[in-house]
């Protein structure tokens, strides 16, 4: 069974991938040196690589040019990376020494050298984007259905919740941001041979350190004085650079973005309402408060996660995951994410269970949404499902701790959306690995049972 459809948009111009890998006659085939009952081997045979090739082909253009990497290689690398929580560097090292990784990615003979450059992973992430990479989630659900780990009924009753996907940034403080803005401006001016009257690097570093020390000692008046000293020096550097590059359009264009960020950092205050700059390299980062005692505020973007409200045999799969920017109210995200889920799976959602943060939601079918603590219209079966609402919390914890959603290193808002989709797909495929291993163990136990004892049973 294949769920959903999905459209693809053209990305960078690249020739259609061509998988013309052949077996090396001087080396043994991978199938001859690995255990064909290994869960990775069984999972590779269950995945419909042709479907992924069809979806990923949307970013390719027919015509001359070097063909892109094989789709199975690209998709397999992304799956392995997020299944086992690996960085790009560690993934490449593991791939070279692990024959199961190579078989999973479609190699026929053992490779002693990488058939791709490590930077290709970054290029393909940017080229595919969320719209194509969500096909990995779709394929994971299709494999789960084929192996009886998930049923169509599990898609009709769902739990929706949101979490924060933190960005890889340092904890933002006014002093740190002002100091970093000054350093970046001075470095950029030096690279473009723009002479400055004074760089203030040494005294700015000292002032930033003293702000932290005074704050730690509860000497807030001195801390404010040191922060004011730092802001004045940052303003001097900004004005000096503007004077020196006046009339030079090339330099003005090069300095424009950093100068705009530096001005915002200099003027913003910790009491200021609305969007602020929390990292110079990631200005899209938002401050989100979830009411946690250990982390009152988190810096990243909001992500909506949907899981079944039932108990699938293979575990609590992630049915849909999407990054949401602008720190929207949870209730206003319900209608679009449910529409995205139904488009992905092709199954109409009949019951939706949410927490109290979704009160005042915008879903059109009000009577299909059940809010935690609701009393009216609650029957015994629905009450049992409402008790399952909290099952989404450990799923979110596993995705963040074990599948690279806990700290997002990808750049920009596109990186937020890409990482959310890949983390959900990696979690689903890890559940499938465990499910296939359980099936294999059950088969072995059934074969090892004595026929006489089986008849007595």
Regions found by a protein language model. Give the residues of each.
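Helix-centered, glycine/charged polyanion-binding patches within enzymatic domains
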Residues: 342, 346-418, 457
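Short, conserved catalytic/metal-binding motifs centered on acidic residues
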Residues: 38, 75-77, 88-92, 117-121, ...
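Basic, low-complexity intrinsically disordered segments
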Residues: 11-15, 53-149
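Flexible loop/turn segments at secondary-structure boundaries
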Residues: 286-289, 312-314, 327-329, 358-362, ...
């Amino acid at each position: 069974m294949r769920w959903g459809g999905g459209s693809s948009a053209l990305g960078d111009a690249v020739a259609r991938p061509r998988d013309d890998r052949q077996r090396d006659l001087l080396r043994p085939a991978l199938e001859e040196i690995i255990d064909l009952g290994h869960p990775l081997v069984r999972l590779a045979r269950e995945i419909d690589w042709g479907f992924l090739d069809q979806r990923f082909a949307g970013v390719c253009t027919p015509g001359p040019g070097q063909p892109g990497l094989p789709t199975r290689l690209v998709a397999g690398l992304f799956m392995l990376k997020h299944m086992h929580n690996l960085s790009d560097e560690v993934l490449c090292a593991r791939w070279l020494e692990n024959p199961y990784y190579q078989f999973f990615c479609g190699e026929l003979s053992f490779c002693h050298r990488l058939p791709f450059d490590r930077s290709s992973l970054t290029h393909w992430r940017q080229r595919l984007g969320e719209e194509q990479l969500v096909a990995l989630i779709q394929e994971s659900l299709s494999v789960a259905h084929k192996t009886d780990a998930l049923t169509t009924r599990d898609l009709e009753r769902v739990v929706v919740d949101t979490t924060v996907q933190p960005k890889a940034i340092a904890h933002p403080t006014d002093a740190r941001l002002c100091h970093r803005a000054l350093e970046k401006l001075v470095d950029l001016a030096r690279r473009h041979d723009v002479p400055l009257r004074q760089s203030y690097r040494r005294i700015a570093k000292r002032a930033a350190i003293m702000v932290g020390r005074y704050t730690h000692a509860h000497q807030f008046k001195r801390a404010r004085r040191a922060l004011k000293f730092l802001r004045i020096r940052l303003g001097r550097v900004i004005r000096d650079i503007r004077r020196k590059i006046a009339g030079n359009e090339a330099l003005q264009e090069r300095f424009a973005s950093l100068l705009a960020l530096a001005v915002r950092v200099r003027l913003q205050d910790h009491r200021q309402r609305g969007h602020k700059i929390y990292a110079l390299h990631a200005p899209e980062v938002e401050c989100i408060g979830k009411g946690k005692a250990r982390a009152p505020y988190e810096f990243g973007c909001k992500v909506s996660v949907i899981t079944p409200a039932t108990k699938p045999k293979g575990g609590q799969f992630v049915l849909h995951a999407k990054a949401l920017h602008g720190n929207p109210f949870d209730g206003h995200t319900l209608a679009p994410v449910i529409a995205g889920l139904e488009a992905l799976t092709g199954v109409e959602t009949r019951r939706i269970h949410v927490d109290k943060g979704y009160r005042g939601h915008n879903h059109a079918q009000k009577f299909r949404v059940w809010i935690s603590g609701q009393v009216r219209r609650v029957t015994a079966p629905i009450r049992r499902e409402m008790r399952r609402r909290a099952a989404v919390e450990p799923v979110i914890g596993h995705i963040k701790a074990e599948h690279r959603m806990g700290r997002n290193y990808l750049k920009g808002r596109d990186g937020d959306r890409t990482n959310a989709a890949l983390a959900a797909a990696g979690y689903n495929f890890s559940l499938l690995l465990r499910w296939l291993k359980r099936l294999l163990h059950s088969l072995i136990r059934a074969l090892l049972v004595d026929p006489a004892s089986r008849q007595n049973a």
